[in-house]
Amino acid sequence: MENRTPMQHHSGYEIVKSEPPSTPKTLIKSSYMENTPEMVFGSFPIHSGFCTQVVTHTDPMNNNNQPKTNANGRALAADRKRPYPCNLCSSKFGSKMELEEHQNSHTGQKPFECDTCNARFNRRSTLWNHKRIHSDAKPFVCTVCQMTFKWKNSLKCHKDMHQRKNETSAHLDNDLRQLTYATAAKRKLQMEQEENGGLPASSSASSVISHPLITTTSGNKKRSKAAKAKQTPSSLATTLSQVHLGAVQPLHASALVPPSDHQIDLDTTSLDSLMQSQNQNFLMQLYGYSDDGRHNGGMLSLDDTMLSNLSDSKSDSGSSSGGLSIQLPMQTINMLNFRNLGTQQLPPVHQLASSLPSVSSGMDYVNVNQHDSHYIVSQPDMMLGNQPLYHNGSFANIEKSNPHNNQFTIDSCVLLPSSRQDYPFDYTMVNQQYPMQEQVHDQTVGVSVVQQHYAEQAHAHGKTVPHEQW
């Protein structure tokens, strides 16, 4: 009978577990970790000779890094167009700038930043596409319905709709395949210039200023230069427009004429003194002062009593509106000559009424001499007792005991200038049947007494009295 013993020491698990690892990954990793890293890829170091060692381990038939030549030994056209290969991969590029952008994908650097949202990108083209989000520019234009789009895919979907309706051709589809964002923007700018008659379109210029298409530089220095280049033409244009508007703008009348509410402050003292002197000279000539040689000197030679009685009647506006109570000295005034009844008339004195102060002193026609052709004007306190009173062309003797006297104000048109010329005046020619308004006062003088004296001394006509019988 055979005894079977288990093989405890010959298990395959224990043998495999005891073997040391001999995979090529560990060998490669251990060999690269011993050296100093020169490039950072993600979160682990990469040796500078990584690409060369990888190429050595690859198939020897793969010669991507070696330039391809033709039978004459010259490099092919594709290789001549892309002379800048990548050290980390088999990619080739036509410019050094494109190679640097490609290496950013290996290193993880993002040097291109958006000015609006501060987003960073590793490729410049990616930044260009991102900036379309912030701008309202729509450079892609449909050639059928002239609709504009921001993205090329949107225009392509729109063209498919026209193609289903048989509104487009294959030539337009081929043109759409070769269309890029830059070429679409240039084409739209040319179309706007043609519509405006060859002049640069203002809308396109405003769109370029407000919505820049592309930022091709990553440095701040070049960016500041581009900003200055954009701001310089606009600032010059605004300055020239302001100068042009300032030259064409007309002159306003308000700059020459002061406003209506502007109060002009004038010194009226000289005008007041002039008017006062004229008024005083007129009063002097009116009451006979001009005949006397002592009073021909003007305002300075007036009598002190007359100057003391004059008061200032000037109101706030500078015009004499209030009346003056002036006590005039006793002087003789030429009365009207009723002998010669001619057609001559008195010169009007109403023209001087505005410049003269109104005289409101009460006068009495008393003490009339029958042999003299003058009326004596006296003050109320110098009234005589039993004197005849002139009333409606006749004389009336009023008793001294009668306290009422017919007092009235002299009208300015009755006063004569100082030349003492006799003017014929007929009261009946002016007022035939109406008595003088300011001379007749039935309330103060008895009607019966007036009628009695009127019957005794009236003339045959009953209206006037001859000059010789006064």
From Swiss-Prot:
Alphabetized UniProt keyword annotations: Chromosome, Metal-binding, Nucleus, Repeat, Zinc, Zinc-finger
GO cellular component term of the entry, any: chromosome
Entry's localization field: Nucleus; Chromosome
Zinc finger (C2H2-type) boundaries: 84-106, 112-134, 140-162
Consequence of gene disruption: RNAi-mediated knockdown causes paralysis and arrested elongation at the two-fold stage of embryonic development.
Stated role: Probable transcription factor; required for proper organization of muscle myofilaments and for their recruitment to the M line.
UniProt family annotation: Belongs to the krueppel C2H2-type zinc-finger protein family.
Identification of the protein by name: Zinc finger protein pat-9
Species this protein is from: Caenorhabditis elegans
The encoding gene: pat-9
